[in-house]
UniProtKB/Swiss-Prot annotation:
GO terms for molecular function: ABC-type transporter activity; ATP binding; ATP hydrolysis activity. GO terms for cellular component: membrane. Belongs to the ABC transporter superfamily. ABCG family. PDR (TC 3.A.1.205) subfamily. This is ABC transporter G family member 16. It comes from the Eukaryota. It comes from Dictyostelium discoideum.
Length: 1528
């Protein structure tokens, strides 16, 4: 039976469906030339697509799919055609969809590709069948999507570079972004197209054309600042904001996954959240999807990130597809899902999508950058866009007719996909073409009959159903329950919370560094406080220490709970995606995180309190202990919740780390310890009552002091011994009488203005709980309503800052490149001194820990031999996970983990310290400076990496201009690079990355997938440039995915790797790839005519028994216990033979050779060989292969491999003089330092939001604190208020420096990359980083210290004022350096925050204020010298307490001393009389210094110590940042 529906005029093989009717009479006769082109390409890829379809045809032979097929049988009127189109889906139809003529691939033998693909596709057909059956309840067949005259625009703050900037844009508005005027920026304009059931639509465009924005509009992911005009209809209904997620599958460009979850765990979480299947069905679906996408072998591998080794980039992309396939078969939307995949994997992925689309009758819209002919054949329609508008939409065969009318014709042997991808570029080069500008293409399409037919069909579709009113504004239906026919969420709220809670626990447990730091922090601080305040008694000393102890507990909680900031930002992208996908409600995610935090916080607190409480010797009553535990726990939870709430509302971690300390600083100040309640001005007293620290401080004190009595030792009585008037007779003196100041706890409470009612402490519990509830509600509101989007319009549109212009001078072709070189940069680009790189017997092993905790030595690369000669290009190709990037890392000297054996020689010599000067490495992950412009980043690289002795400054700048020109970066040259989701596009980032490395004019250029993420035109241009580089005498080694035939033929040699890191071929490519194809042909593998040789070689590399090979990669490492047992058996068992002994010895040697420090980071692709039996079986299998060699053995024993080894061993050509460098770096230290200093300073200025936040924080705290201590009096309260004020300035500085850690942490990955490239010296970077921060630190310190000095009313002395602000700046600078040290040496941001909490707590505790130096136990005296805070408190105290300052007592501050004396008129009945004489404790500043054990000389000594600490931290940063590098 034939397929009667003519929705798609082409079949899977790209052939024109003769039954399809053109949309107008003028085009009923297809041009013979166009038909010839299409048919020629159809023939060229026929064998491949049909062979792949061979196995799929078996879908119809099984009864398992019968029920699914019946569900899709339907008759319907298709408004897109004038006649009735009857779709009858039966066995024959399915065969026609997937190809029923299964011809063999060439003339190949039993072991060839036909047998391989036959078995592979039979399995895949079964998997597709199972997938559709399992997900039958979630599938949505017969969907139709209509986009009718849709526009999309956003309101953006006026760009400083915008030509529309007026006089209103003042200097202030440039500094403060939110003061700029908003302007409307159009991103998408007048889009009209449709997606019908079963249609496969290929979306082709240039970078910056708004494709990703279009997908966001279709999936209802647009930001609130944007607006849509026009209609988007799904099944003739407008988008329903509540249920729209169930209408589509969307695979976006970015891969957002939690790095510490495995592939299987990530997929299972998605299945649980998005399906309502049975438990068994969910397991089958998980296994099914992993198998369809070819990632079953990495199911138990972590996803990974920049610091954690995990799956490869291509596997991450397939993981992104996997979590969407969970939804079932429905409208499919894919935004560049093949980036990072090899061509075979890309075809397999899209072929699976096409099967699902056709069999389930759902539409698919897929954007691709470099589609191969095989991939191109999968699509029925083409949608082309440029500058946010459509330049064509229609059937695949129609597009060639359309463009041929304007002089753009596809040549006979040209790939149609490449022709269409480069059509705008070709139009510029063709003088006969009538289309030049973007508007020409747009107008041409809108004047065509194809556009008119599209509008007619859209109108017919809309008229067929009158449910929609036709309003021109998009209608998002919110909360209309009567229109919801299904549940928005698949799971109940309880189940959602359970799943999120399980995931939260997994991610926390696997962050071992963070857990370890938390446990150590709680234990150490518990021991520290417990032993510092060890066994407090009833003395006056203990009475004075209790308030200090209570306050320190508050600071401990604050410093220890700020680590929650980093967690929010690491999980935010994943949460945003899953929130939009309706995985769970925001409240479920929140509650899961809340419960997780409550549990982990309790563990922290119980460790801390259990240790410290009993060591301190607080009240032994059980109820008092549990209340103490409760109070600390509630405060810890509240502080953690506030930190996370601030993070939810903050755009980045640096802002959150600035705002959160502001909150804590203010409310710590208002707690009632540093300044008593009655001393707080009435206008700030409200802050005292809403401060959570006030309630906990008072509760802890009240809990301990009620019922407590105190006594005095002789040296604690007042007036003290040695007081001049103590023994003077009354009334001039005290007649030797003394008094005990504090006799019970109630007196302490009253002195602190605390309610003495015992039940008062319970109020704090309810108030803290209320505050926790408030901040929880705010968190839920933020999670539900705030999304920091990444649509950046002004980089894509008006200013030309984001699209590839092919107009005028910016149109570059190969001839112009050659001309540009000859005229301008030939001298710079030609390499007079050549470099040879050889590698022999290169093997790479790592140690991993498997699921059963068995340690395994895994070989990732096996005996790799090869070389690269000057002027040649070597391609490293292989499937995903074959080890291409690993090999490139090793050759480029970027691997510092694992065990590398073999020989790598540069010009016949081992690599030395100058090796990286010869090479440049374009890494797969684009590590770029966020706050530099494109030109600045490239110029920075050129100026530092090009030698000054052979090139002038102008030569370097000319090189930069040339690279900008060739890579077509001029249009964005002055645009900030930004982050991945908030800057230039991914395609542009790739070109910038290549440009930065090219700027060094390397002798050997390593490139890891340089064309991934690029359009065909951009890829072609880049490879032209790279070829030109090679022709100028440089060596190029490049891994590449999905190369077009044109690009592939530019290489001179290839190194073909198989799964497991084996070599299948190394040698010349030959003219038209004949050399390598002849080699394959000799082995019985013939490349079909017209097939891309690169794709054929990838198929060839997979034609071996991978299971046995991969199993043999692993060698078990026996445990120490088993080794001892084996040795014992050998010693005592006479039957032990020499082989057993050798086996033990070999295992021991293997253990010694593996880096044991990277067990968790070295998880790789395969998880076979779970026990010794597997290895024995693999060994046996390999031994059997000797009689029937596979492609690996064939190459290993081939003449080609022997010839390669002979060439390597023969050494350098006779007379060759190797190029040598004497210095590791190309430029001097001073030049590097000033370049880095300038970059740091400029980038810091461009962080405007962060600068303004810190400025506001400094000014706000200065004003609030100053007015709180407004014009301090010289009474007794004024004495302690001065000391507490000085101490608070240190607390503010300590908390403020936390915001520096995220910035340093983010920048260090760029530092690692540039340091590996020998861009600069390690010392120059560290010095520049620290010194560049000096001006900003000075500014922040002055904004705080200068106003507050006079507001508080310290001594009216200019010298003392200048000393105050100078010492405060020094202290702040030291803390900044300390935070920079932690940012450089901590493995994670959470760990850095935990270490900061411990450090700042210790600094505050031992500064001499909370506990005086005399009261510090002898075994902790050294911590007083370690405390950085001491060196601020002491000099500022001396500065204030010396000079003309004096103090007095107000009447209520005098201490009455009882005196018994004999009056002159005494009688026998009353010989003595009791009187009271008032005592004023402090009248001079030196008394304060004496009490705190501070000397006048400390003022300057401590100042020099601060300077020394600054230098010391600088040295520590230099040392530890060189030793510790946290990379994969």
């Amino acid at each position: 039976m034939k397929l009667t529906n003519s929705i798609s005029p082409t079949n899977l093989d790209g052939e024109i469906n003769k039954n399809s009717q053109p949309s107008n009479d003028n085009q009923q006769q297809q041009q013979p030339k166009i038909n010839k082109i299409i048919n020629k390409f159809s023939e060229s890829i026929n064998s491949v697509s049909k062979t792949i379809g061979k196995g799929i045809g078996d879908l119809t032979s099984s009864n398992a799919l019968d029920e699914h097929i019946k569900n899709h049988n339907s008759n319907f009127i298709d408004p897109f055609y004038n006649e009735e189109a009857v779709v009858v889906v039966d066995d024959e139809n399915i065969r026609s969809l997937i190809g029923d003529n299964c011809s063999s691939i060439g003339n190949i033998g039993v072991n060839g590709i036909e047998a391989f693909y036959g078995e592979h596709n039979n399995k895949k057909s079964e998997l597709i069948k199972q997938f559709l059956k399992i997900n039958s309840t979630n599938n949505k067949s017969n969907q139709t999507i209509v986009v009718d005259h849709m526009d999309y625009s956003v309101m953006e703050r006026q760009s400083s570079s915008s030509s529309s900037s007026s006089s209103r844009s003042t200097g202030v508005s440039k500094l403060i972004p939110f003061l700029k005027r908003k302007e409307k920026i159009e991103i998408l304009k007048d889009l009209s197209f449709y997606l019908k059931p079963g249609m496969m639509v290929l979306l082709l465009s240039e970078a910056g054309s708004g494709v990703s924005t279009l997908f966001k509009c279709l999936t209802n992911r647009i930001p609130k600042r944007g607006s849509i005009n026009g209609d988007i209809l799904f099944d003739n209904e407008p988008i329903d904001g509540e249920s729209h997620h169930s209408q589509y599958l969307f695979v976006q460009q970015s891969d957002h996954h939690i790095s510490t979850l495995t592939v299987k765990e990530t997929l299972e979480f998605s299945i649980e959240c998005q399906s309502n299947l049975s438990r068994e069905a969910k397991k089958q679906l998980s296994s099914n999807i992993l198998s369809i996408l070819g990632i079953s072998h990495v199911a138990d591998t972590y996803i990974g990130n920049q610091s954690i080794r995990g799956i490869s980039g291509g596997q991450k992309k397939r993981m992104t597809v996997a979590v969407e396939l969970v939804k079932g078969a429905k409208a499919i939307m894919i935004d560049q899902a093949t980036n990072g995949l090899d061509s075979t994997s890309a075809f397999e992925l899209l072929n699976s999508i096409q099967m699902i689309s056709k069999v389930s009758n759902v539409p698919a819209l897929v954007s691709l950058l470099q589609p191969s002919p095989e991939i191109f054949s999968l699509f029925s329609h083409i949608l082309m866009m440029k500058d946010g508008e459509i330049t064509f939409f229609g059937e695949k065969h129609q597009i060639f007719d359309h463009f041929s009318d304007y002089g753009l014709e596809c040549k006979d042997k040209q790939n149609p996909a490449e022709f269409l991808s480069s059509i705008y570029h070709q139009a510029q080069l063709d003088p006969d073409c009538q289309l030049k500008s973007s508007s020409d293409f747009i107008v041409a399409y809108k004047q065509s009959q194809y556009y008119k037919d599209c509008l007619i069909k859209i109108s017919q579709e809309r008229l067929s159903n009158h449910k929609f009113s036709g309003d021109k504004s998009i209608k998002i239906i919110e909360n209309e329950k009567e229109q919801q026919q299904q549940e928005i969420y698949q799971l109940s709220l309880i189940k959602q919370i359970q799943l999120n809670l399980k995931r939260a626990f997994l991610t926390t447990i696997r962050d071992r560094a963070s857990i370890l730091s938390r446990v150590i922090k709680s234990s150490l601080l518990g021991l520290l406080i417990g032993t510092l305040f060890f066994q407090l008694d009833s003395s006056q000393k203990s009475a004075n220490l209790l308030p200090s102890l209570s306050f320190f507990l508050l600071t401990f909680v604050v410093f220890g709970s700020l680590a929650g900031v980093g967690q929010v930002f690491s999980e935010r992208p994943v949460f945003y995606d899953q929130k939009i996908g309706k995985y769970y409600k925001s409240i479920a995610y929140f509650f899961a995180g809340l419960v997780s935090d409550l549990i982990w916080n309790f563990i922290d607190v119980i460790i801390f309190c259990s240790i410290s409480y009993w060591l301190i010797g607080l009240n032994h009553s059980a109820d008092r202990f549990f209340f103490f535990l409760l109070a600390i726990y509630l405060l810890d939870c509240l502080v953690n919740r506030v930190s996370k709430m601030v993070s939810i509302y903050s755009p980045n971690a640096a802002i959150a780390s600035t705002i959160a300390p502001l909150y804590f600083s203010l409310f710590l100040l208002m707690a009632g310890y540093l300044i008593h309640r009655n001393s707080i001005p009435i206008y700030w007293r409200w802050m005292h009552y809403i401060s959570p620290f006030k309630w906990v401080f008072e509760a802890i004190l009240s809990n301990q002091l009620h019922g407590q009595t105190f006594t005095c030792k002789s040296d604690e009585l007042l007036p003290p011994i040695g007081y001049p008037l103590l023994n003077v007779s009354f009334p001039d003196g005290y007649s030797g009488s003394q008094v005990c100041p504090i006799i019970d706890g109630i007196e302490i409470l009253k002195s602190k203005d605390i309610n003495s009612d015992y039940s008062y402490k319970y109020y704090s519990v309810w108030i803290i709980l209320s505050m926790y509830l408030l901040f929880s509600i705010l968190s839920i509101i933020g999670l539900s309503n705030i999304t920091f989007d990444n649509i950046i319009s002004n980089k894509e549109k008006n200013n030309g800052n984001g699209n590839n212009n092919y107009n005028g001078k910016e149109s570059i072709n190969e001839e112009s490149i050659k001309l540009s070189i000859k005229q301008h940069q030939q001298k710079q680009f030609e390499s007079n001194e050549k470099c040879y790189l050889t590698f022999k017997n290169l093997t790479y092993k790592v140690l991993i820990k498997k699921k059963n905790h068995q340690k395994v030595s895994r070989t990732l690369l096996h005996d790799i031999n090869g070389y690269v000669k000057p002027g040649s290009m070597v391609a490293l190709i292989g499937s995903s996970g074959a080890g291409k990037s690993t090999l490139l890392d090793i050759l480029a000297n970027r691997k510092d983990q694992g065990i590398i054996s073999g020989e790598i020689l540069l010009n016949g010599k081992a690599r030395d310290k100058c090796f990286n000067r010869y090479v440049a490495y374009v890494e797969q992950e684009d590590t770029l400076p966020d706050f530099q412009t494109v030109r600045e980043a490239i110029t920075f690289s050129a100026l530092l990496r090009l030698p000054n002795d052979t090139m002038t400054h102008q030569d370097k700048l000319d090189t930069v201009d040339y690279i900008l020109d060739v890579l077509e970066l001029n249009s964005i040259a002055n645009t900030l690079i930004g982050k991945v989701d908030h800057g230039i596009t991914q395609e542009q980032r790739k070109r910038v990355n290549i440009a930065i490395e090219m700027a060094s004019l390397p002798d050997i250029l390593f490139l890891d997938e340089p064309t991934t993420g690029l359009t065909s035109v951009a890829a072609e241009l880049i490879m032209q440039l790279i070829k030109r580089v090679a022709l100028d005498g440089r060596s190029v080694i490049c891994t590449i995915h999905q190369p077009s035939e044109t690009i592939f033929k530019k290489f001179d040699s290839i190194l073909l790797l198989t799964q497991g890191g084996f070599v299948a071929y190394f040698g010349e490519l030959g003219p038209n790839c004949r050399t390598v194809l002849n080699y394959c042909s000799d082995l019985g593998f013939n490349c079909p005519q017209g097939k891309n040789p690169a794709d054929f070689l990838l198929d060839f590399s997979a034609s071996f028994n991978s299971a046995s090979r991969l199993a043999s990669n692993d060698k078990m490492i026996p445990s120490i216990r088993s080794r001892i047992k084996n040795v014992g058996n050998y010693c005592f068992d006479g039957s032990s033979n020499l082989n057993n002994k050798n086996e033990i010895k070999q295992q021991q040697t293997t253990t010694q050779n593996v880096n044991l420090g990277n067990e968790d980071k070295q998880q790789q692709q395969q998880e076979e060989a779970n026990d010794d039996n597997n290895i024995q079986e693999a060994t046996s299998s390999n031994s059997n292969n000797n009689n029937n060699n596979d492609i690996i053995d064939n190459y290993q024993f081939s003449n080609l491999n022997r010839d390669t080894i002979e060439i390597i061993d023969s050494g350098l050509p006779i007379g060759f003089i190797s190029k040598t460098f004497k210095e590791k770096n190309a430029t001097s230290f001073l030049f590097q330092f000033f370049m880095l200093l300038f970059r740091f300073f400029v980038c810091a200025i461009r962080r405007r939001n962060l600068i303004m936040t810190r400025i506001i924080r400094s000014i706000l705290l200065s004003v609030v604190t100053g007015t709180l201590y407004l014009q301090l009096k010289n009474d007794q309260d004024g004495v302690m208020d001065r000391i507490s004020f000085i101490f608070f300035t240190s607390t503010f500085a300590s908390i403020s420096c936390l915001s520096n850690i995220p910035t340093v942490f983010e920048d260090r990955f760029l530092f690692y990359h540039e340091l590996n490239s020998n861009t600069y010296r390690h010392l120059s970077y560290i010095l520049a980083m620290i010194l560049a921060d000096l001006p900003f630190t000075i500014m922040y310190s002055l904004l705080f210290s200068a106003p507050i000095y006079w507001i508080v009313g310290l001594q009216n002395d200019v010298d003392k004022f200048l000393f105050f602000i100078f010492v405060y700046y020094l202290y702040l600078q030291v803390l900044v350096s300390f935070s920079q040290l932690l940012g450089m040496v901590s493995p994670t941001l959470a760990t850095a925050n935990e270490i900061t909490g411990i450090s700042f707590s210790v600094f505050s505790l031992f500064a001499g204020f909370i506990i005086k130096k005399d009261d510090i136990p002898s075994y902790y005296k050294w911590l007083n010298y370690v405390s950085i805070t001491r060196y601020l408190v002491e000099p500022l105290t001396v500065n204030e307490m010396t000079g003309s300052v004096s103090f007095h007592c107000e009447p209520h501050q005098l201490i009455p001393v009882p005196i018994h004396y004999t009056p002159t008129n005494a009688t026998a009945s009353e010989p003595t009389k009791l009187v009271f004489k008032s005592f004023c404790p402090i009248t001079q500043g030196n008394q304060v210094l004496y009490q705190f054990d501070i000397n006048d000389t400390d003022k300057f000594e401590d100042t020099f110590v601060l300077i020394g600490l600054f230098i010391g931290f600088l040295l520590l940063i230099l040392i530890f940042s060189k030793i510790l590098k946290f990379k994969k």
